[in-house]
Amino acid sequence: MRKLIYIIVGIAGILGALSRYYLGLTIHEFWHHTFPLATLLINLAGCFLLAWLTTYIAKLNILPSDVITGIGTGFIGSFTTFSTLSVETIQLINHSEWGIAFLYVSCSILGGLIMSGLGYTLGDFLLKKHLTEGDHL
């Protein structure tokens, strides 16, 4: 059993969680509305990054697979948060903010799919460009 992967994922997870916390605080400094913008932006960025990572960086073989796993599962996994999305939605519903709750869930799901698609498209484009320039995987 490779114990190093657990350390890599754990450290990356700590960094992802701290990044989410800091970015959330930063966004809350200028966003003072009911809509949970910080969680939405963080989750959308994570969707883009994970798709790009798995489509492009992982296939270049420039990083060991343990590092790719650490970034994807550890950093991005702890950077994004489905549980916060769920709790914030319930809080909005409990405060009768039905419209905002619907908008939040809709933006999260559709936006996540769009950002994942963009990350995949960019990764695929960069990979094809990399391969046509004579570099091989």
Swiss-Prot record:
Record flagged with keyword Transmembrane helix: yes
UniProt subcellular location: Cell membrane
Swiss-Prot/TrEMBL catalytic activity: fluoride(in) = fluoride(out)
Superkingdom of origin: Bacteria
CC per GO annotation: plasma membrane
Regulation of this protein's activity per its record: Na(+) is not transported, but it plays an essential structural role and its presence is essential for fluoride channel function.
Membrane-topology descriptor: Multi-pass membrane protein
Cystine residue pairs: none
Gene Ontology BP, a term: cellular detoxification of fluoride
Keywords recorded for this protein, A-Z: Cell membrane, Ion channel, Ion transport, Membrane, Metal-binding, Sodium, Transmembrane, Transmembrane helix, Transport
The keyword NADP belongs to this UniProt entry's keyword annotation: no
Transmembrane segments: 4-24, 37-57, 67-87, 98-118
GO terms of molecular function: fluoride channel activity; metal ion binding
InterPro entries hit by this protein: FluC (IPR003691)
Positions with a binding annotation for Na(+): G77, T80
One Pfam family cited in the UniProt record for this chain: CRCB
Protein purpose: Fluoride-specific ion channel. Important for reducing fluoride concentration in the cell, thus reducing its toxicity.
Family named by the database record: Belongs to the fluoride channel Fluc/FEX (TC 1.A.43) family.
Name of this protein: Fluoride-specific ion channel FluC 1
